[in-house]
Amino acid sequence: MRYCTIPPVHSPIIRLQHGILSKMKLIYFSNEFPPDDLHTLFRELHNHSKDRRHPILARFLEEATLAVREEVRRLPAHLRALIPPFESIWNFADFADLRKGQLCGSIDGILLCSVELGTLIRYYENNPDAFNLETGGTILAGLGIGLLATAAVSLASTVADLPITGAQVIRQAFRLGILVDEVSQNLQPRDATDTSTPDSWAYVLPNVSASEVQQELDTMQGIVKTPEASKIFISALSATAVTISGPPARLQAMFRTSQFFHDHKSVALPVYGGLCHAKHIYTVEDVHHIVRTSSMALLDSKFSPQLPIHSTSTGAPFPAVNATELFEHIIGEILMRAIQWDKVIQGVAQLAQDVGATRCEIVVFRNSLPIHDLAAALKTIPGLETSTQEIIPWVHSKPPAGEGGPRGPLQSKIAIVGMSCRMPGGATDTEKFWELLESGLDVHRKIPADRFDVDSHYDPAGKRLNASHTPYGCFIDEPGLFDAPFFNMSPREAQQTDPMQRLALVTAYEALERAGYVANRTAATDLHRIGTFYGQASDDYREVNSAQEISTYFIPGGCRAFGPGRINYFFKFSGPSYSIDTACSSSLATIQTACAALWNGDVDTAVAGGTNVLTNSDAFAGLSHGHFLSKTPNACKTWDCNADGYCRADAVGSIVMKRLEDAEADNDNILGVILAAATNHSAEAISITHPHAGHQAYLGKLVANRAGIDPLDVGFVEMHGTGTQAGDAEEIQSVTNAYAPTTRRRTAKNPLYIGAVKSNVGHSEAAAGVTAMLKVLLMFQKNAIPPHVGIKTGLNPIFPNDLDKRQVRIPYERTEWPHVPGKKRVAVVNNFSAAGGNTTILLEEGPVQEATETDPRSTHVVAVSAKSKISLKGNIERILAYLEQHPDASLANLSYSTTARRYHHNHRVAIAASGIAQVKKQLQSALDSVDSHKPIPTTGAPPVAFTFTGQGASYKSYNLELFSSSPYFRSQILHLDAIAQGQGFASFLPVIDGSHQRDHQHSQVMTQLALVCTEIAIAKYWGSLGVKPDVVIGHSLGEYAALHIAGVLSASDTIFLVGQRAALLEKKCKVGSHNMVAVRASLAQIEASAGKYPYEIACINGPKETVLSGPTTEMDAIIPVLEGDGHKCYRLEVAFAFHSAQTDPILDGFEALANSGVLFQAPQIPVISPLLCKVIFDDKSVNARYVRRATREPVNFLSALEIARDIGIVDDETAWIEIGPHPVCVGFIKSTLSPVNVAVPSLRRGDDNYTTMAQSLAALHCAGVKVEWSEFHRPFEAALRLLDLPTYAWNDKTYWIQYIGDWALTKGNTFYDKEKGLNSAPAALPTPKSSISTSTVHQIIQESIDGEAGTVVMQSDLMQADFRAAAWGHKMNQCGVVTSSVHADIAYTLGEYLYKKLKPKSKQVHMNIANLEVLKGLIANKNPESHQLIQVSVTTSDIGSNTAELTWYNVHADGTVDEPFASATLIYGDPSEWLSSWIPMTHLVQGRIHELERLAESGVANRFNHQMAYLLFANSLVDYAAKYRGMQSVVLHELEAFADVVLSTESGGRWTVPPYFIDSVAHLAGFVLNVSDAMDTQNNFCITPGWRSMRLARPLVAGGRYRSYVKMIPTAEDPSVYLGDVYVLQDGVVVGMVGGIQFRRYPRILLSRFFSAPDDAHAPPVATSTSSKHAVATPATKGVNGVKAVKAAPAVNGTNGVKTVPAVNGTNGVKATPAVNGVKPAPPVEVEVNSDTTTAKAIQIIAAESGLDLADLTDDSSFADLGVDSLMSLVIAEKFRADLGVVVGGSLFLEYPTIGDLRSWLEEYYS
């Protein structure tokens, strides 16, 4: 008897049946894993794959891995996130949890197929002759997934084909598992919280018949009316057993309730991935979905079935003629047909008889029961000898010793996808760098002052010890600029961190930003798979700058290993980080190392580069003495005949690299492609520093060979080209020999261009390689070669004289280098090390990338974000500028680039627009409102609530763009529609697919199913975008979708309930007999208006939103009544009056259906019930009775929301999303729960779906909801390109420790002792250059007069008697403080002196001292025997301009000067003009004085006499000596006053304008602010940093009588800053004015910090002062006498000798529990304060100073959120010192940003 149909003649079985065969072979693939340890099997297969004898096995594992990677990339984000990083498919064997979860079917499928096919390949590679399968009469059989594996063998003609065919099997297995899981979860959702072994979907029952089982199933499922899709069915049968399958819960229920199944033995099978062999669930479309891929089409073109595979349902071979048909047969078999192994046995036995076989070899992996049965049947055939061969043991076998070996490195092309730089010459980005190169600039300059004093450290004669022989270099502008807060660094840490590290961090961010990097967006950007690699060859900043102030961050901020480590730490990369030093080749060697990591699979993305910032004069001196450096003023004179060494340079560059296939899959911009890289050593050179042409040429050829590139195809070589005679000559020889040899001549059409970037920007040493790499990448991008500018005089004469013949060309001007279609431009970068190493990298241009499709979306989201308002403004401005420069920019690409391909920070702007013009308009509007912009909280994303719309918002037919263009949404709809059709309902697709007009009416079953299924699909679509609900609420019909999304109902049961209910309504209720009317009124208002009319309340939607139901006649009667009272009414377009008596006829039947066939489960997220007006958490509340009541009873949406709010399920921060075809519920939510953070619709009637989605996504994004933007763009990514947008706009400030003095010259030697006068008596002051000498200007030490320009420098000793008396006559905090009037006298003296020097004939000189700014208070030493020198310079470039600039400095003991502590501008003027300009103000001032007189007479203003005024002033702040006490009386009202002044007649001192005269007429302003009862003088004091102008039109004379007037007002920008104008009157005329005098208010507790003598060892740490001009974080340098620099928090470490406890990372504070599923967390633990510990007292101080309750200071409270700013930080720090003895600085709260962090630190060190 035959058990198969006659196959077509082209089937492979025909070939087997023609003729008699003596031997048959059957290869059997099981559906069970071998009993061997799976990890061991894969590990041994992996080890075999490394052996060169098993290239096919290796290729199979590689191809299988690539196939899985490709399928993983296509997964939705929520599934992709489940898969850990993997290097090879065999890694999945280690993912135990994954094999239990949602992807278990896919993972086990690929593992089983991999181990079986890998084992088979390993077996046949060892026995290649045995794979002559066709002539050997081979047939194939398998079970389950094993049947799928047979396809690989059937299609393969040779073993070498198996990697390709096997990879397709792996792909199909993975796709099959995904589909099976997705479909099965609609039948019974998996419990995501259960991590134990899942329940089985299949049980085997031995010793029963299939008919018995089917009869019992029919009976039981008929009783409970189980939906068709959820029914249990027979999935496999044999003579001795039957296997049944179905949803696990239903199987378990069946075994509990059925006596038949209870009485029979059953065994659960390890089937956890879902249902197969289910013809009632799956369709041919499902088969096509799995099989028909682009890779399958490729397989069809190369392979066709060679061997027969026996069907497990018929026993006959599959009649397939190509790969697609074969896989469709097999997938269809697995999905839709029951297994009947007996038929396979019969079919094989029949075949053996038909061909007359005498021997049959059965090849198995391990023996099993099906093979036992098959072998037993074959043995009954007469004359047939049967044997079984297990091949798993071959996996465990070891190769004989001495055989095999490594297979070789895996070579991929490496794509460079991002770049950034900081280069000399102002090249702060790659575009400016190209402009520099293209312009042919040489950007050398003298060593700038921020590095070291070039004059003292440079000696061209080479005689001075440790001095440089050259004063030149190429330098980055302002290398200290850095956005410390962005990178989570305190000012102190930033200041002490090497600028190389900082700029590496910045350029890494910019390069990643340009690469479109977003963490974990793709497999290649998984944080575990990213590493950093940076070259650095020196630690200048640590050795020189920060070594002057060694503190906490000296090691991590200065040691080079921390550079790449810091990048990894900031970005949270957990791949490797390397800092590599190979001298001048460091960065290119590092890039090669990064390539190796990519080639080896150690990382999937690499960030690499190099850094060099020069601050150490030692290196200049050492390289000078080593004869490396040129002494001439130029960058490197590369290839010049007079080349004499190189010019040192700064540079920082970063690039981002990926394997090319990953970059293309990630849709990256590919700037260039590295084909090969290698390093060798010039071992045979004459010295370690000397190059060797032979080794260099060998390396060049080696790299070309590895890349598979003809050396003649190289079009450009970027040479090392340092400009040394030896280096240039050796390199040109090596380059010409490698790429332009004499043996193979280049043609004129194929020249070799050479260049060297060092001729533009110098030799940046460790960064030279990446600098050269960036140049080449820019050449690819710009299609041009920039001019070479190194040849200043003539070409090096020792160069080969046949360069022209070899077609080697030097581009002396910009040369076009265009892209040629069909041919890649190829370039080489050379980088050599002074230590002997040579590194060469060969690159080609990136592939041309063009969009292959069109994005159909009409509206797009554009997002801009930053970490600060300043940067947000800058980022918006940059985008606007980009759009101006690129008017043709694609909006779709802009959206994709700013959303899916950028990091999103807490200051956000997102807009939805349909055109670039709209984008510009909206961004401009956002720009104008940046200052009022509020950032999203940093505490985490807000909870999300889904609200599901009822039928009242639906419309008859809708054309969903999502259905047509979103594969994910479409797949969800199709799966749900298939379930509906499987349950006997008509397809609802016509309602949503656009096939009908919007007003086309469908049946109620179709309409209601369409609504609910659309809402389910929308909710899941939101989930695919990463937006998942923490709580749900459904309105009326929408509640069914809500219950499904919450996990209460399966999709199958949801469809069953909705469809059956609609069918009952159609059957038992009359359409149109009843109506529903929405009324804009409350229940009370309706009752008051229409209480006597009959109606039913259907919905209570909001405070004034109510829906009535009832018969149409009753509704017709009530509407005019309600509208007559002003209540707007409108009828809902619904067929039936839900929630009214009209539904009564269906209630019993509906409840019965729900009771019999539906499983209600506990919700996985809270459900807000409008029926029960409560939040449901349990598995009892929702049942058949519930759905009955929900049909009939009112929807109390209002009360449900209020209850949810009251118990904390939702709050003001909740983000609401309406799930439905048109928004209705969001209006109810806003009116009920106002204020609402954000409430948005999913779809809107009349609007394109993507317009609504874009608007909603933009709003959610700005509210802080995390959106998976990549998933939003994924269906359209083929149409999208990443734009090269401007990089982040940094909020930079300067962080820099200046090298002070010349200790780098003098260290450890006596060479300079004589020069400095050391080891002898203290040096006298420098010899005076002039005889001028006053009490404040002691001697002129420098004088330079050149025509109209001039400079005068003076030095004075503050300890000289008159000067010291002037300082101590102005005491603050018992310290002598140099008042601004002293600075004014100095200014008048020097200004007059300089003016008369330049204009000797001038007699009287009048000056306006403008813009005086005192950055640091000048405080006198207590010891008068000491010296305390200051230096002041005055300079003018043109006295004709009538201006000069003044600068004040402190002078150190070694004669060096500090940073300037004060500055001013002198403006020479005409006093008559001043007097005239003040005339209009005189009567106003006099009027105010008269008003103050009147207020004083009436007792409103205060009048103080001379003694009382100065007593109050002394008690408040300043204790003046008698000479300064000129005010005879003061009248004061609030912040306004006038004083009568008589100047002292006491003589003494030599002054230009005596300071006590100036102070007497001007210090009224300080008196007002420090004495007035309008100020809190008990807790605060005010001091001045300067004024805008000081003009005295008449001289101040001893004994002169004056009147001063001032009114101080707080500034709008900063209420702690006060401004005013002091008017000086004489005889009723304004004769002088101090304009724009400024005071700042400080807490009094800081007085000691601000004003302590420099030589006081017991002084507290010096605090910071104020400036309106200098950047916040500009650090002070050491040795400052007085107040340190502007707003920079004082250093915590050892200021003024006070030892402090070292800081630790503040990361161990207690954090608040985040909200889960929308439920608010319990209140954070309050800080313990009821103890006498230092910690408790510290917390109490913080509470007192910040004005907060102790309850507010929870461990998770951040100081920034509590309002602890830099000033309050100083106050609290001073309180800690004074009250607790805890010495800290104001930066403490930057380093320990939360209460918990600070508490942990205090407890560690002070408890």
From Swiss-Prot:
Its EC number is 2.3.1.-. It catalyses: holo-[ACP] + 8 malonyl-CoA + 8 H(+) = atrochrysone carboxyl-[ACP] + 8 CO2 + 8 CoA + 2 H2O. Residues 411-845 form the Ketosynthase family 3 (KS3) domain. Pathway: Secondary metabolite biosynthesis. Residues 1338-1648 form the PKS/mFAS DH domain. Residues 1334-1653 are annotated as: Product template (PT) domain. The keyword Phosphoprotein applies. Residues 41-173 are annotated as: N-terminal acylcarrier protein transacylase domain (SAT). GO terms for biological process: fatty acid biosynthetic process. GO terms for cellular component: cytoplasm; plasma membrane. The lineage of its organism: Eukaryota, Fungi, Dikarya, Ascomycota, Pezizomycotina. It comes from the Eukaryota. Residues 1500-1648 are annotated as: C-terminal hotdog fold. Multidomain protein; including a starter unit:ACP transacylase (SAT) that selects the starter unit; a ketosynthase (KS) that catalyzes repeated decarboxylative condensation to elongate the polyketide backbone; a malonyl-CoA:ACP transacylase (MAT) that selects and transfers the extender unit malonyl-CoA; a product template (PT) domain that controls the immediate cyclization regioselectivity of the reactive polyketide backbone; and an acyl-carrier protein (ACP) that serves as the tether of the growing and completed polyketide via its phosphopantetheinyl arm. This is Atrochrysone carboxylic acid synthase Agnpks1. InterPro entries: Ac_transferase_dom_sf, ACP-like_sf, Acyl_transferase_dom, Acyl_Trfase/lysoPLipase, Ketoacyl_synth_AS, Ketoacyl_synth_C, Ketoacyl_synth_N, Malonyl_transacylase_ACP-bd. Keywords: Multifunctional enzyme, Phosphopantetheine, Phosphoprotein, Transferase. The active site is at residues 584, 720, 763, 1370, 1559.
